[in-house]
């Protein structure tokens, strides 16, 4: 064999070996792969089953490809390299859930409609949410409990100059615009964080995280407690220390597993409270504290924006209970003896308030009904379930029946006497298995014994000055 041919064959063999090794590298590194589902805010593909429901899984290889793509060794580094190239070379976001803004800012894509003033709530949805919050407030007031509602503004609501130019704002009203007006109309005690933050020349949200800083959380805390009837500590002399060690959520969505290097402002506070029971993280569904320096007992319904504020509240109250679960369990007031309730929700999730009613005993109402139209043949939905100590009856009323200010009552009849319970005007989208939120719903939590002992139940709707009735069989 000529020498030149031999050298060529050797090079060819070396090339083949290198190629095979490169192909096998991701497979060999599988044991080193890690779960990045939390950082990417999605569930990674599971390893497929060969059989499903006793039959051969014909999608096995497609599902295996998805699993391997999500779990191959070194995937996070390849994703990071691709993301960096897209962001810094092409000026594009590699993650459809993240908006690449100006000046290195990142925004959550789910806030785009709010930014553009494209409301996901109808006007009646907004009114229904405000009525629900007013009913929650009345429930608290009747028990001598203070109530405050607040909304954590989206980052691009406060700092629009850092949004990309191709995101255009319309002249319409956002969910928050509509709801703020309805809260005022129905007299709901509202801590307006949007107005407070807009007054500040300093940015209190992190450029590459969707939340406010601890310093921004302090501003929110002060705004909220200033709406309460009793005075609480404002931590007026607190100082903040800057450290570049924060685990920014939007960065993790772009760069899963990236080091924690974003700037955070940490408060210099010595806390006296202690956490009851086990504590895992700020995202625990329930955090209970005792021994705070202040007075009173707090029940706070919160989301991830509460991660940087709950310690302030825990210190300001002797006892506190922070809950992330929905529906909001307002009956917890009696269990813990709370004298204050705060409900905080981020702007982008306001639509959720129209889709799930709080869990509390429905208020009794005095009504005189002489006659009502039977609408049981209309396009209504009525369903029920047992929910803890409650009998939960919910559904929807035929849309053509309803005006913008409808009310729904559950009638419990026993021994010829009728008791009226007002339902929340909430459409239980998840329970009704609807793909979208509607604005013609009702949801009512009755004490279980009321439903059990009643001779009959019915649904009474008041709309356009008329009464409409739907009999219900338990």
Question: Which residues make up each language-model segment?
Answer:
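Extracellular glycan-modifying ectodomains
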Residues: 2-474
